[in-house]
Amino acid sequence: MSARPPSRLPRPPDFEALAAAAPASADRRTEVLALIGHLVFSWSNNESLFIYVLMLLLDTDEVSAAIVFATLNTTRARLDLVQRLAKAKVADRAVAGELDDLVARFSRQTKLRNDLNHCMYTVDAEGVITHTQLMKLEERGGRLSFGRVRGMDAARRAELAEAIREHGALNRDLWSFLPRLEAHLVDRRPVDRSPA
């Protein structure tokens, strides 16, 4: 009988040691989790505002726009629809440019949100979240590797805090833009000249 080869699996965590060490690292862990939670909360609120952009571009009601929004099952598909409808419906270059900018800003934030939602989190022996590893394959030099690893250091936490601030600004800018988009589209609405 041949010897069994060594396991290729990572060693499981020492759960008892982590549980014992967890209280001492709770503040740091809570800080990281609060940043991630705030980012996801802000991102979701901003994505939902695109329902109103769709409502205006489709010249429909809120429920119908939400149905279209929910039927498209990826953020990219939703933003693509917004951009295509804008090309068909928005004639004012300033309004179109502002919408393009809002979509671009949201898309940049979507990458960070996806990175944090679709990763493995590494904790050290004290229970501190030290790294993230993306849950996707990357090709480098013709070789596939499993997801990029990034530290959860002070610079990364500052990046998250800045992204949250940007989401706050984006939220205000989206709310400010919606009435301008509505006014532009109302001005372009064809006049019904059919007999009564």
Model-assigned labels for residue ranges:
Residues 2-41, 48-196:
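Acidic, Ser/Thr/Gly/Pro-rich intrinsically disordered interaction regions
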